[in-house]
Amino acid sequence: MIRGRTAKVIPRNVIFTLSRSSISESPLISPSRINPKLAGSFSFNIRLLSYFTVRNGFCPDCSVPRDPNFVGLTTQCRSIVRRFCSEKIGSSESSGWTEEVEYLDESGSVLHSGKGIRSVEPGLDDHVMVGGLKKPYMNASSVAKIVEVVQRWKWGPELETQLDKLQFVPNMVHITQSLKIVKEVDAALSLFRWAKKQPWYLPSDECYVVLFDGLNQGRDFVGIQSLFEEMVQDSSSHGDLSFNAYNQVIQYLAKAEKLEVAFCCFKKAQESGCKIDTQTYNNLMMLFLNKGLPYKAFEIYESMEKTDSLLDGSTYELIIPSLAKSGRLDAAFKLFQQMKERKLRPSFSVFSSLVDSMGKAGRLDTSMKVYMEMQGFGHRPSATMFVSLIDSYAKAGKLDTALRLWDEMKKSGFRPNFGLYTMIIESHAKSGKLEVAMTVFKDMEKAGFLPTPSTYSCLLEMHAGSGQVDSAMKIYNSMTNAGLRPGLSSYISLLTLLANKRLVDVAGKILLEMKAMGYSVDVCASDVLMIYIKDASVDLALKWLRFMGSSGIKTNNFIIRQLFESCMKNGLYDSARPLLETLVHSAGKVDLVLYTSILAHLVRCQDEDKERQLMSILSATKHKAHAFMCGLFTGPEQRKQPVLTFVREFYQGIDYELEEGAARYFVNVLLNYLVLMGQINRARCVWKVAYENKLFPKAIVFDQHIAWSLDVRNLSVGAALIAVVHTLHRFRKRMLYYGVVPRRIKLVTGPTLKIVIAQMLSSVESPFEVSKVVLRAPGELVMEWFKKPIVQQFLLNEIPSRSDILMHKMNVMFPSSAPELRSMSPPKPLMSSKAF
């Protein structure tokens, strides 16, 4: 308590307190507009706050206005008014202290007495007078006053006006401490921005840290970004800031997942020369990794490596799994080695990520090495790690190691899951280890897992592929009994197996079950039919085709044609005709190749009954070539045109771009047939028209006076004989009528036709000498030979060869049924030249 004897002024740094004390002798205070609760029994006491002297603190809630309105006080009490020492009150008399002031405690005892504490002028001095001594103005008092003003005026011009009127000159320590006390962010920012305008302002990292913390608590990230820009400007202009605030801003933004803003601040901090700490790097990398941008995180990590920042354990734990999962295994393993060299203990997640990633990348040795090291560090493998290792080794085909890990997993107390069972079974089945696969399959069923259709299918297909019919059927029945629907591939594998084993009845049963399951069975049934056709099992193919027809299953024209050709090749003409009729009625195209192949069978046929069947089949084709054949053997009265004209009209109707090979094949077979039938003139007409249409463009070559040649290597026997006779006749006319005699004439026959042609020419004493593949003679000798009457008769009339020998050679040497082979490939020789 204070007892004022003649006091004019209450010092500013003295706090008024109200206490209910009967010892106090001070007059009572009536209610006022400042504190209406001040009434009767409250005594007016003044004491120094012990917080100032003991804790250097201040309570901002208690202060006295400059002109308090003390209602109900005596004149003496009303003279207790705050005044500055320089004030003039109506006279020239100074308003200083006139008498001593006694300081009392609550019991009324005198604590101290002396001259009153003189107030100071704003901005003129930073001390107070205690008697005649100067005493520094306490920081706690300054901070308390600043806080009082800020909390009252909050923000705006009025706040700045009040702060400008402070009786003391603040410094950055006062501002920093005030910011720590003021909890309202807007008020704190107003105080800070006022301080920035003052001449005594210096950038303070601590101030920014306090402000950023307040903005972060209020989730005002826009304000953080704005204040960060101010801080960057302060740093560039003064350069006195430390880097705590930079790092704190980036950490706040990273934890709030403000990716773009955080990275922008990170770049600006780097440009400002800020030293980024490890925690900031960690937070940024975690942000980018969580956002699915691992490569950006690695970019930050690389920039971290370039600085003096050291990786700590948390950074290793963060970056190694990310590098491993992104495929940068060498970098991840290098950091793993560094981590161990720095005596840091890797966590289980580091080991797990390396084991998993190395295994999936096929680096199984490294994966197993890390796995063994992990056990050396005392970590126990998890079920997930076992699954990853087993999966990696199984996919790599190292099934022995996979089984060892499988047993180790079960010994560790882990129960293999459904997927692991499936993987082990399928990997062993696909590698051909069906016994191991079936053993694990039975264990899977005992463990209570129902195998998936894919597991059943894998086992079924592998057993089917290995030809184990009984095991495949057992798995199929087990699958259907379990209520599972076999897949299309399973049905195809099983049907293929049954077809190869020639189990037609069982295959038909499976096909009907497949149809009942809702699958389209036409293609599968056709595939089975094709297997029988390729296997030359014509009887089984016909049986399967009848089953398909009775079950309403259709096949395509291509397979019908293949089966028809197989029947023709095996002499089953009775079965072939219905197939041909089916092909024709289903709008299937009977082309020139197919017709020619039937004609080829007719050429080789020596049985009259079969000839009738073949003629019936030729008629059933309804091909235009058959009408041509019929017209070719009729007389000119019925044709109403010469043979040559008739043949030319037929060949003009052929599309040579699409059917050139077929037309060449038809010429070869037709000439064989005509020669056998003794129709030499008709055969020569066919050859002439074929040569005119350039079906054999390189057959005849006139090399002026040097050499004339005929190449018959690509012709059938009949075509070669006709070509030789017709061409020699042309050579004779050219030499006798025009007098052009070449040096030599060659007949290029090849090894196959050489003997036949040589035998034919030897009957008329030809001058041609026989070599390996060519018959050649000088032009003058051939000229003399052409002058003989027998040669003229030979070239104009018919071929004097024995029909039985020619027929026998045609049966043996006739080309195969393939279109190009029929027309291009030379037939094989019947016997050697020595035999002839």
Swiss-Prot record:
Domain of life: Eukaryota
Predominant location category: mitochondrion
Gene: EMB2217
Key words of the record: Mitochondrion, Repeat, Transit peptide
Range annotated as the organelle transit peptide: 1-85
Per-repeat ranges for PPR: 204-238, 242-276, 277-311, 312-346, 347-381, 382-416, 417-451, 452-486, 487-521, 528-555, 556-590, 591-625
Pfam families per the UniProt record, alphabetical: PPR_3, PPR_long
Disulfide bond entries: none
Domain Smr: 710-786
Annotated family: Belongs to the PPR family. P subfamily.
The name this protein goes by in its record: Pentatricopeptide repeat-containing protein At1g79490, mitochondrial
One cellular component (GO) term of this entry: mitochondrion
Lineage: Eukaryota, Viridiplantae, Streptophyta, Embryophyta, Tracheophyta
Cellular localization per UniProt: Mitochondrion
